[in-house]
C-alpha cells in the first residue's frame, strides 16, 4: 500500500496548473448516459474516482475512452442499466447514474453507495425527488430499483441542500415530460458546470447558478463538447500549503471567483493575494493568524476545505474555532494532526485549534480524502520526516499531487 514520505523544509515557490474538478467531472461523465450521441469532455482529471466511473460506464455498455485529459463517451450500446456493489462501494458518486438511467431507459438498479466514511450522507433526497417525478422505487438487498415509463415534470423541494441530489434530479429532469422545478437546489460551481454541459446537449434549463432550477423536458439530447471547470478544492489545498510554508505560489487555470470564500479567509490569515481572470498568486511573509470559520453550502466556506485550514491553523498564531455543519464525523484528522504536535480539541461539530510554532514529523494515517490533504500540508511544515499511510484516499481526489508539490520545492515522494 503506497505512502507519502515528506521531509519538512522551506517555502513552496513557483507555479502549479490546477486540474479539472473531480466533483464536476463525475456527474458530467454520467451525463453521457442521457444521449446516444458522442459527448467529448476535456480537462478530466486523472484520478482513481474518474477511472472507476469510466469503468462503471463501460460495464453498462457505453463506449468510454480516455486519452490524456479528454474523455470520449458514446451511449449507443448501453445494455445493462445497473451499478454493481463492487464498483459503487469505492465511490459514492456512482449514485449519479440513477437519474440518467431512469430518464433515458426507464429503469435502473444501483447499489447503495460507499466512498469516504464521513457520516451518513443519505440518498433519500435523490429517491424522494425521483418519486415526485413518477418513478417507482424500491430498496431490496442493498440495491435501489427504479422504474418509470417516462418521468413527469414536478416541483421538487429537497429537505436539505444536496449537491449530488441536485445533479441527479437535474439530469433526470432534462428528459422528463413537462416542467420540473428544483427548489433548494445546490449552487456549487460544479452543479453550474454540469448544467452548462446539459444546455450544450439541448436541455432547457433556467436559473443556472441559483437555488431554483427550472427545467423544460425534451424528447432527446444530443452530443456536445465541454471542458470541466477547475478544481477549486485542489487550488485551495495548494494555497493553504503555500500559506503554511510562508511561500510564494501562482496557480494557473483557476477563475478566482469560484474560490471567493477561501480567499477571504486566507487574506484574514495574513496572506497577500493577487488575482487575474484565470490565475491566483499567494505570498506569505509572516506566520499566519488563526482564522475561525463555519462550513456551509456554496457560496459559503466549503466543507471540503475544512481539514486543510485546520492544518494551517495548527501552525498559526492564536486560537481558531472551526464548526462543521455539512457532514458528521469529519474531524477524524484531528487525532493524526495532534500526533504531529498540533494542539486541537474537538467536541461535537466544533474543533478548537491553538496554533503552535512548529510541528514535528511522525507516522500518521489518512482517514479520508481531505483529511489526507491536511496531513500533507502539516508534513510540509513539520520538522523532520512525516510518513502518511493509506494515501489511496488522496489518489481519489488529487491528480499527481506529489509531482505538483515537488515542482514547487516540496520534498515529497511516494513509497511502497
Swiss-Prot record:
Domain of life according to the entry: Bacteria
Keywords: Cell cycle, Cell division, Cell shape, Cell wall biogenesis/degradation, Cytoplasm, Peptidoglycan synthesis, Pyruvate, Transferase
Compartment annotation: Cytoplasm
Record-listed E.C. numbers: 2.5.1.7
Active site: 116 (proton donor)
Main subcellular localisation: cytoplasm
Positions that bind UDP-N-acetyl-alpha-D-glucosamine: 92, 121-125, 304, 326
Entries under Gene3D superfamilies matching the protein: Enolpyruvate transferase domain
Enzyme class at the top of the EC tree: transferase
UniProt: phosphoenolpyruvate binding residues: 22-23
Keyword Cell cycle: yes
Reactions catalysed according to its record: phosphoenolpyruvate + UDP-N-acetyl-alpha-D-glucosamine = UDP-N-acetyl-3-O-(1-carboxyvinyl)-alpha-D-glucosamine + phosphate
Sequence positions bearing 2-(S-cysteinyl)pyruvic acid O-phosphothioketal: 116
Any one GO molecular-function label of the UniProt entry: UDP-N-acetylglucosamine 1-carboxyvinyltransferase activity
Biological process annotations from GO: cell division; cell wall organization; peptidoglycan biosynthetic process; regulation of cell shape; UDP-N-acetylgalactosamine biosynthetic process
Lineage of producing organism: Bacteria, Pseudomonadati, Pseudomonadota, Betaproteobacteria, Burkholderiales
Similarity section: Belongs to the EPSP synthase family. MurA subfamily.
Gene that produces this protein: murA
Protein name: UDP-N-acetylglucosamine 1-carboxyvinyltransferase
Amino acid at each position: 500500500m503506497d505512502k507519502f514520505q515528506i521531509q519538512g523544509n522551506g517555502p513552496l515557490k513557483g507555479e502549479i496548473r490546477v486540474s479539472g474538478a473531480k466533483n464536476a467531472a463525475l456527474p458530467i461523465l454520467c451525463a453521457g448516459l442521457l444521449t446516444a450521441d458522442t459527448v467529448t469532455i476535456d480537462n478530466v482529471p486523472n484520478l482513481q474516482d474518474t477511472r472507476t466511473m469510466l469503468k462503471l460506464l463501460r460495464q453498462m455498455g457505453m463506449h468510454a475512452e480516455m486519452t490524456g485529459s479528454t474523455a470520449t463517451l458514446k451511449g449507443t450500446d448501453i445494455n445493462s442499466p445497473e451499478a454493481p456493489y463492487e464498483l459503487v462501494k469505492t465511490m459514492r458518486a456512482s449514485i449519479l447514474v440513477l437519474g440518467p438511467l431512469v430518464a433515458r431507459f426507464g429503469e435502473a438498479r444501483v447499489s447503495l453507495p460507499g466512498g469516504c466514511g464521513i457520516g451518513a450522507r443519505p440518498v433519500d433526497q435523490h429517491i424522494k425527488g425521483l418519486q415526485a417525478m413518477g418513478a417507482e422505487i424500491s430498496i431490496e438487498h442493498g440495491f435501489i430499483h427504479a422504474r418509470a415509463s417516462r418521468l413527469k415534470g414536478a416541483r421538487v423541494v429537497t429537505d436539505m441542500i444536496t449537491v449530488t441530489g441536485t445533479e441527479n434530479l437535474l439530469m433526470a429532469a432534462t428528459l422528463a415530460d413537462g416542467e420540473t422545478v428544483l427548489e433548494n437546489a445546490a449552487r456549487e460551481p460544479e452543479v453550474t458546470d454540469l448544467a452548462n454541459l446539459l444546455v450544450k446537449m439541448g436541455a432547457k434549463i433556467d436559473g443556472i447558478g441559483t437555488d431554483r432550477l427550472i427545467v423544460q423536458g425534451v424528447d432527446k439530447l444530443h452530443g456536445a463538447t465541454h471542458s470541466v471547470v477547475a478544481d477549486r478544492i485542489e487550488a485551495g489545498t495548494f494555497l493553504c500549503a503555500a500559506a503554511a510554508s510562508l511561500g510564494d505560489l501562482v496557480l494557473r487555470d483557476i477563475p478566482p471567483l469560484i474560490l471567493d470564500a477561501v480567499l477571504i479567509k486566507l487574506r484574514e490569515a495574513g496572506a497577500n493575494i493577487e488575482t487575474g481572470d484565470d490565475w491566483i498568486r499567494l505570498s506569505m511573509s509572516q506566520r499566519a493568524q488563526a482564522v475561525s470559520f463555519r462550513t456551509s453550502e456554496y457560496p459559503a466556506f466549503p466543507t471540503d476545505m475544512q481539514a486543510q485550514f485546520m492544518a494551517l491553523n495548527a501552525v498559526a498564531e492564536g486560537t481558531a474555532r472551526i464548526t462543521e455543519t455539512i457532514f458528521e464525523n469529519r474531524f477524524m484528522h484531528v487525532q493524526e494532526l495532534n500526533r504531529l504536535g498540533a494542539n486541537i480539541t474537538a467536541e461535537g461539530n466544533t474543533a478548537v485549534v491553538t496554533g503552535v510554532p512548529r510541528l514535528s514529523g511522525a507516522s500518521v494515517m489518512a482517514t479520508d480524502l481531505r483529511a489526507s490533504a491536511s496531513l500533507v500540508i502539516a508534513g510540509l511544515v513539520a520538522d523532520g520526516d512525516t510518513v502518511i499511510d493509506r494515501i489511496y484516499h488522496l489518489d481519489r481526489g488529487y491528480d499527481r499531487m506529489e509531482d505538483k508539490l515537488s515542482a514547487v520545492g516540496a520534498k515529497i515522494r511516494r513509497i511502497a
